[in-house]
């Protein structure tokens, strides 16, 4: 049937590109932030927490 071709799913390349999840964004700042919080406590890591928030915002996350 000729009408079915138009209803077929997108090519595999388009399906593989999924939106970035917050857990996977900014791994460098996330790792530094988490290590600081574990070692020193959250109250001593404000600069790393803010750096991670800025990175997330730059990627379009609303934090």
From Swiss-Prot:
<dbReference type="GO" id="GO:0016531">
    <property type="term" value="F:copper chaperone activity"/>
</dbReference>
<keyword id="KW-0963">Cytoplasm</keyword>
<dbReference type="GO" id="GO:0005507">
    <property type="term" value="F:copper ion binding"/>
</dbReference>
<feature type="modified residue" description="N6-acetyllysine">
    <location>
        <position position="18"/>
    </location>
</feature>
<dbReference type="InterPro" id="IPR007745">
    <property type="entry name" value="Cyt_c_oxidase_Cu-chaperone"/>
</dbReference>
<keyword id="KW-1015">Disulfide bond</keyword>
<comment type="similarity">
    <text>Belongs to the COX17 family.</text>
</comment>
<keyword id="KW-0186">Copper</keyword>
<dbReference type="GO" id="GO:0005758">
    <property type="term" value="C:mitochondrial intermembrane space"/>
</dbReference>
<keyword id="KW-0479">Metal-binding</keyword>
<dbReference type="GO" id="GO:0008284">
    <property type="term" value="P:positive regulation of cell population proliferation"/>
</dbReference>
<feature type="binding site">
    <location>
        <position position="24"/>
    </location>
    <ligand>
        <name>Cu cation</name>
    </ligand>
</feature>
<keyword id="KW-0143">Chaperone</keyword>
<protein>
    <recommendedName>
        <fullName>Cytochrome c oxidase copper chaperone</fullName>
    </recommendedName>
</protein>
<dbReference type="Pfam" id="PF05051">
    <property type="entry name" value="COX17"/>
</dbReference>
<dbReference type="InterPro" id="IPR009069">
    <property type="entry name" value="Cys_alpha_HP_mot_SF"/>
</dbReference>
<feature type="disulfide bond">
    <location>
        <begin position="26"/>
        <end position="55"/>
    </location>
</feature>
<dbReference type="GO" id="GO:0007507">
    <property type="term" value="P:heart development"/>
</dbReference>
<comment type="function">
    <text>Copper metallochaperone essential for the assembly of the mitochondrial respiratory chain complex IV (CIV), also known as cytochrome c oxidase. Binds two copper ions and delivers them to the metallochaperone SCO1 which transports the copper ions to the Cu(A) site on the cytochrome c oxidase subunit II (MT-CO2/COX2).</text>
</comment>
<feature type="region of interest" description="Disordered">
    <location>
        <begin position="1"/>
        <end position="20"/>
    </location>
</feature>
<feature type="short sequence motif" description="Cx9C motif 1">
    <location>
        <begin position="26"/>
        <end position="36"/>
    </location>
</feature>
<keyword id="KW-0007">Acetylation</keyword>
<comment type="subunit">
    <text>Interacts with COA1. Interacts with the chaperone CHCHD4; this is important for correct folding and the formation of disulfide bonds that stabilize the structure.</text>
</comment>
<feature type="short sequence motif" description="Cx9C motif 2">
    <location>
        <begin position="45"/>
        <end position="55"/>
    </location>
</feature>
<dbReference type="GO" id="GO:0008047">
    <property type="term" value="F:enzyme activator activity"/>
</dbReference>
<feature type="binding site">
    <location>
        <position position="23"/>
    </location>
    <ligand>
        <name>Cu cation</name>
    </ligand>
</feature>
<dbReference type="GO" id="GO:1903136">
    <property type="term" value="F:cuprous ion binding"/>
</dbReference>
<dbReference type="GO" id="GO:0005739">
    <property type="term" value="C:mitochondrion"/>
</dbReference>
<dbReference type="GO" id="GO:0033617">
    <property type="term" value="P:mitochondrial cytochrome c oxidase assembly"/>
</dbReference>
<keyword id="KW-0496">Mitochondrion</keyword>
<feature type="domain" description="CHCH">
    <location>
        <begin position="23"/>
        <end position="63"/>
    </location>
</feature>
<feature type="modified residue" description="N6-acetyllysine">
    <location>
        <position position="30"/>
    </location>
</feature>
<feature type="disulfide bond">
    <location>
        <begin position="36"/>
        <end position="45"/>
    </location>
</feature>
């Amino acid at each position: 049937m000729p009408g079915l071709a138009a209803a077929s799913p997108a090519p595999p390349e388009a399906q593989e590109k999924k939106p970035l999840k917050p857990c996977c964004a900014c791994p460098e700042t996330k790792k530094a932030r988490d290590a600081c919080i574990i070692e020193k406590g959250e109250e001593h890591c404000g600069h790393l927490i803010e750096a991670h928030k800025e990175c997330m915002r730059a990627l379009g996350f609303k934090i």
